[in-house]
């Protein structure tokens, strides 16, 4: 019997994702036993400051990646959207599971749909990407900074009597809370974060036997979409502190990728799309990013990062 040590954050959602990966591996590989190790990250420790103000990449991954590089664990499981656009030397994304619904959703204990939200509604979110796009759609919305895991945010929504909160659909569904969803935010209204809805499995680049094991659970269409979106993000040098978004989808054998750069107040935004063959996924994402930078996105990002 072979043992595989899996590192993950300790939130309910992170543990769900880790157990899901472990289950897939154990069911596809006889005599494999996966041990789960929880690791606390910087992002888990700093809960009273907006992510955009901490200003560090890898907030939810750095400590896990250190243990991976040091040989303390064999693989790491992440929400793809938490991974920095550039991985540490010696590490790679070895597998991506089939993508869950990438959209954002509205949760409202007052049962508001998007169309029902009152003037100056109080909406909780800490994402600059969501804030910029929501302001572009409804400048009247009062956006309240909100950090914490899914359960914490739901509790804060009720305690602070907010009209709603915006979360990633995937996390809500994976925790079995789908009945709490009041409405879905279409991608043309709020484009998702890079990698939203994807579970990524990271490994050491030189561990060929581990890479081979992980290839058994890889979903190639999702992997390619992730490459395109991460290519877009990498070209922008992005992370949690910049209001950018991207979504890639395979349609009829072609990869369709959309991208967005927006100002924090939602008054300026540059968006575009392109199509490519799957082998060109990453470069297509980079090329789309370069196009948006030239249109005016570079000035927005420069201003945002001041």
Curated annotation (Swiss-Prot):
It comes from the Bacteria. The porphobilinogen subunits are added to the dipyrromethane group. GO terms for cellular component: cytoplasm. The modification S-(dipyrrolylmethanemethyl)cysteine is found at residue 240. Its EC number is 2.5.1.61. HAMAP family: Porphobil_deam. This is Porphobilinogen deaminase. The gene is hemC. Binds 1 dipyrromethane group covalently. Pfam families: Porphobil_deam, Porphobil_deamC.
